[in-house]
Amino acid sequence: MDGGGETTATATMEGRGLKKGPWTTTEDAILTEYVRKHGEGNWNAVQKNSGLLRCGKSCRLRWANHLRPNLKKGSFTPDEEKIIIDLHAKLGNKWARMASQLPGRTDNEIKNYWNTRMKRRQRAGLPLYPHEIQHQGIDIDDEFEFDLTSFQFQNQDLDHNHQNMIQYTNSSNTSSSSSSFSSSSSQPSKRLRPDPLVSTNPGLNPIPDSSMDFQMFSLYNNSLENDNNQFGFSVPLSSSSSSNEVCNPNHILEYISENSDTRNTNKKDIDAMSYSSLLMGDLEIRSSSFPLGLDNSVLELPSNQRPTHSFSSSPIIDNGVHLEPPSGNSGLLDALLEESQALSRGGLFKDVRVSSSDLCEVQDKRVKMDFENLLIDHLNSSNHSSLGANPNIHNKYNEPTMVKVTVDDDDELLTSLLNNFPSTTTPLPDWYRVTEMQNEASYLAPPSGILMGNHQGNGRVEPPTVPPSSSVDPMASLGSCYWSNMPSIC
């Protein structure tokens, strides 16, 4: 117990003890006289001042539920029952707040009435609330929390009413597209809300507006980051069957063909690139932030539906190569293949390695070409007189078109050089033949007599002189001399 008479009440309770159980008429009279003199409140002082052997809580409940003057007794009237049902539909089990709306009725009485009524109607299989109270309760709940399951998306009307919903915008009117998106999605993004007129009218079905079924999401690129992809498009929130029609790459190609002529003057020079970079492309659609929190994978385009480069509509490259647009609507990959073939025919990618699997073969052919060019230069400089005997060969290798020897006729070139080279009258020694046989395994090794021999004015080739040595094998010394005198290739 607490209050002013805590010590006295404790001593009294220890000596005589507090009484429990039903109240008697004498106890009711003592409590009524005390409240008439001292008023309501400070119930713990009742025992000290009146000598009533009851605790403060028991006195308060006895006064509020049985002894107060304005207390109503008996069963609830039909009007009171209707008020209790309405209040319970709005407030729930707030018995004290409900009692404040019913003068003369206590919270305990209201609770007992409701529990008894609920059990009785459940046993009878009747609804807890009347029909009109149920509709009103649903409308009131919609004001606080909107049930997302009430949205009924009409998928069957999607293709009929929203076939032309995709909107292409150029980079020049990016601000206008942003403003149109803001106006179309002006509803709060934190929670989808129904029309307030629908939620407040109990006779209307709370079906949202048709604009709620199709929220527009804008995907656009930053024009400062990539000027080759200066277009944007909007995708409606739709089913999977209609999304394939909306994201048709043929529409994107048509739009690019119409708007790419204005951007041809701003193109940069195309540098030498590999076929893999041309096919893969350096152009990707960067999705903007979605206001409703959708996942990026929902609106991500497939790999075969990504837009192509801005030069896909037959631009003119610096060297005069025309890139024709794809003849059919087979897809963007075919268009890129045709463009790469056109560029390769125009000579832009003449020296580009096709794939990593052919890298070794191409490098070997280039080494051959470099060696052959070096051989031609050496013959033109040091063996001019010998080649002068046959002017056809001299003119052949001094033409401007033979600056760089092609790979296809390398075998024919080597054969012609060996056949037209002046023959020597002096027989070659045995060590020369052995050395030549040892070096036949390397396809890079030229005829050893050409590079190692001393070219004279009469066209004779003399083998190099080897200093005599008794302790070193002449074959080993000749082999090391041969490889040390090899000219540098790269």
UniProtKB/Swiss-Prot annotation:
Alphabetically, which GO biological process terms does the record hold? Answer: gibberellic acid mediated signaling pathway; pollen development; pollen sperm cell differentiation; positive regulation of abscisic acid-activated signaling pathway; positive regulation of DNA-templated transcription; positive regulation of programmed cell death; protein storage vacuole organization; regulation of gene expression
Q: What is seen without this gene?
A: Hyposensitivity to abscisic acid (ABA). Reduced expression levels of aleurone-related genes (e.g. CP1, CP, GASA1, BXL1 and BXL2) in seeds. The triple mutant myb33 myb65 myb101 has a male sterility and exhibits slower protein storage vacuoles (PSVs) vacuolation rate in aleurone layers upon seed germination. Reduced production of abnormal pollen grains with misarranged male germ unit (MGU). The triple mutant myb97 myb101 myb120 is impaired in pollen tube growth arrest and subsequent sperm cell release in the female gametophyte thus leading to a drastically reduced fertility.
Q: In which tissues is it expressed?
A: Present mostly in flowers, siliques and floral shoot tips. Expression is restricted to the subapical pith cells of both vegetative and flowering plants and to the hypocotyl hook. Expressed in pollen grains and pollen tube. Mostly expressed in mature pollen grains, and, to a lower extent, in inflorescences and siliques.
Keyword Ubl conjugation attributed: no
This protein's GO cellular component annotations are:
nucleus; pollen tube
Organism per entry:
Arabidopsis thaliana (Mouse-ear cress)
What does the function comment of this entry state? Transcription activator. Binds to 5'-CAACTGTC-3' and/or 5'-TAACAAA-3' motif in target gene promoter (e.g. alpha-amylase) to promote their expression. Positive regulator of abscisic acid (ABA) responses leading to growth arrest during seed germination. Promotes the expression of aleurone-related genes (e.g. CP1, CP, GASA1, BXL1 and BXL2) in seeds. Together with MYB33 and MYB65, promotes the programmed cell death (PCD) leading to vacuolation of protein storage vacuoles (PSVs) in the aleurone layers during seed germination. Maybe involved in the regulation of leaves lamina morphogenesis.
Instruction: List the Pfam families.
Output: Myb_DNA-binding
- Protein name in UniProt: Transcription factor MYB101
State where composition is biased (Low complexity): 169-186
* CDD domains, A to Z: SANT
Record flagged with keyword Chloroplast: no
Main localization of the protein described in the UniProt heading: nucleus
Locate the DNA-binding region by residue range: 43-67, 95-118
What does its record list under induction?
A: Repressed in germinating seeds by microRNA159 (miR159)-mediated cleavage in an abscisic acid (ABA) and ABI3-dependent manner, probably to desensitize hormone signaling during seedling stress responses. Induced by increased upon gibberellic acid (GA) treatment.
Please list the residue ranges annotated as the HTH myb-type domain: 15-67, 68-122
Q: Where is this region: Disordered?
A: 1-21, 168-206
